Amino acid sequence: MMKALVVVALLVTLISYSSSEGIDDLEADELLSLMANEQTRKECIPKHHECTSNKHGCCRGNFFKYKCQCTTVVTQDGEQTERCFCGTPPHHKAAELVVGFGKKIFG
């Protein structure tokens, strides 16, 4: 009977040790993932900033990702250049307005 208790205690100890290592590995993976996401957030282009060289790098807004919106600018020399900035498209603004209005009504 005593040998059985010792074996069971040993098995419980081994299982808890191996599961704690697995949890530590999961926590480390989760931490690395969060750090990568934070790095991505730092590298994204904020609203109203220029995105001419990186048209897919705009940050996320409250509900949607900002879109790179481009316009043609004519310089004083008469040259046409394309300038882009991160902004909220009109249909996204309308959706945000409706959601905000709905939140005020329904709380």
UniProtKB/Swiss-Prot annotation:
Keyword Secreted set for record: yes
Free-text tissue specificity from the UniProt record: Expressed by the venom gland.
GO MF annotations, alphabetized: toxin activity
Entry's localization field: Secreted
Cysteines joined through disulfide linkages: C44-C59, C51-C68, C58-C86, C70-C84
Signal peptide as annotated in the record: 1-20
Membership in a protein family: Belongs to the neurotoxin 19 (CSTX) family. 04 (U1-Lctx) subfamily.
Identification of the protein by name: U1-lycotoxin-Ls1b
Source species: Lycosa singoriensis
Organism phylogeny: Eukaryota, Metazoa, Ecdysozoa, Arthropoda, Chelicerata
